[in-house]
């Protein structure tokens, strides 16, 4: 048993020693595995570094030659820079020498100019002395003329006031009291005593029948709808559109004389606006002599430019219309209105209407029996800082008010009848200024320029054109009457034909553009209808008038009113397009040659306007068939209108023959540009040498064929046109003033 125990003990010891060895071996193995992992990581890191080094080595091999090349280039640029700096220093020296020489030349030129200016100053001083002497004479004459004008003005005003007070207005009752400030204060006794006589009709008949009659009388007299307005007539398609596109041009001078050259405005002016104000009052003696002499032009110019203000005598004058309906209302309502005014006036003294004792300046209304006859407002005319500069008109004039006004020229009392008329007139010109400012951003369009007829407004002051040449002076006054009459008759025929819609012109526009124009047209129709009704006379209270507010309607809504083109119009437009692409010359109705199609010449960019004008001339000739079409360009017609209008019918035939000759010369080299306009001296010399012999005509044609394209335009023609324009404006001003004086004298004699 002891041996067995020893044996077990030894086995146990041996097992313990083996287990310890096994544990130590396992620990060593774990440590070795960890070292192996670390070594593997180091190997992988070294491999990555090796790959990076290999790539960098490859890049270095590729970049090294480039670097060497860049170094060489840098050395070359340094050498070039040194050379450029040396050249720059040389050039700077040359520039300094040139500047010194230029300064010397400039100093010599300045000294010469100073000498010339000194000489001119001496001459101008002498001229100023002569002008001063003449101005003294002119001032003496102006003082005499001013005294005469004041005497005539006083006589005219006295005769007007007497005629209106005797014929149109009753005498003021003795019971009416005026204060020292020429004002009327309405109270309870005044309103009851003056309005009691109209209450007798309210007691007649039954109350129900009276209400029925009142309901019948409270209906609209005549009021068309917007959808009933026609937009297929020439008064909209041609006249109004041409007026709008002419008005929004930047170079258009916004004043009365230039507005009256547009047919649309001229027709409205003659038939609707000018007859609104039958009598234009004189300006006070504090204004200048020119303004007093041009009282009509000053008055209408102030309305057009917005330099007027219509203000009540007292603030309460604007509120009395809310309760007061005048004599046209029924007796009961009149009593109620009178009682309300009296109660309000007795309760608060600040709402009492105040009137002026003086009669109305424009119609002579002097009655004081009711509030609608009293002068509760006054019109103020302002003078701007730029009043004397009539040509500098811009969109800043569209702002109506007193911001740019300096002082009041005159103040006139107004009755309610003239108040409504003048308010509508001011609104009319405000709408025109609104169109002028182009608030709807309309695009510039020259398609309607050919339909804008500019008639002569002062024929009796038309100057006879005289052109001097080497042989002497030739006057065209003998032949001006026949040519002027023929031109005026042809223009009148064209205007009347288009006004009667015998010839329709349908110029296509964009849909948005057309809708904007329709809104503007309806806006003008609205204010024109208000002017018409104001001339007839009506009471402008809010509950008595139905008016549309166009500002609440967007312009896109008016696109539904655009008329659709008919089948005939579409076919006609197709014919016009096909004719515009026709490239061969053709003969017009009167035998004149018209050049159409493509024009090939070195001056092609400058002939776009002439091509458009020639195509339009062809279409107009085909549509009218009996009209006369000019073959000259539009620019030539504008520059030499006076010279061409003074020629006789035989000279016009000669000009057409010359154009045909020029056509035959240019046909071999395709169609060239249109015939240049000849100088007026050559035209008149040829007109003197022109006789009825056919041999001389052929000689003139041959000479013209040789020298037609060698003519050059002179800058003196532009100066001549400018002088003619200024002279025409002064003559037109004189004509308007004489017309106003004659009309005022005629009204005074009639009364």
From Swiss-Prot:
One of its GO terms (cellular component) is cellular bud neck. Its main location: other. Keywords: Coiled coil, Cytoplasmic vesicle, Guanine-nucleotide releasing factor, Phosphoprotein, Protein transport, Transport. It is found in: Bud neck; Bud tip; Cytoplasmic vesicle, Secretory vesicle. Residues 694-709 have a biased composition (Basic and acidic residues). GO terms for molecular function: guanyl-nucleotide exchange factor activity. The modification Phosphoserine is found at residues 584, 598. SUPFAM superfamilies: Sec2 N-terminal region (SSF144284). GO terms for biological process: filamentous growth; hyphal growth; protein transport. The keyword Coiled coil applies. Phosphorylated at Ser-584 and Ser-598. Phosphorylation at Ser-584 by the CDC28-CCN1 and CDC28-HGC1 complexes is required to support hyphal growth. In stationary phase and growing yeast cells, is constitutively phosphorylated, probably on more than one residue, but the pattern of phosphorylation rapidly changes upon hyphal induction and precedes the appearance of hyphal germ tubes. Residues 22-162 form a coiled coil. Residues 574-587, 595-608 have a biased composition (Polar residues). Residues 326-346, 469-499, 565-724 are annotated as: Disordered. Residues 327-346, 475-494, 667-693 have a biased composition (Low complexity). The keyword Coiled coil applies. Belongs to the SEC2 family. Guanine nucleotide exchange factor for SEC4, catalyzing the dissociation of GDP from SEC4 and also potently promoting binding of GTP. Activation of SEC4 by SEC2 is needed for the directed transport of vesicles to sites of exocytosis. Required for filamentous growth. This is Rab guanine nucleotide exchange factor SEC2. It comes from Candida albicans (strain SC5314 / ATCC MYA-2876) (Yeast). The lineage of its organism: Eukaryota, Fungi, Dikarya, Ascomycota, Saccharomycotina.
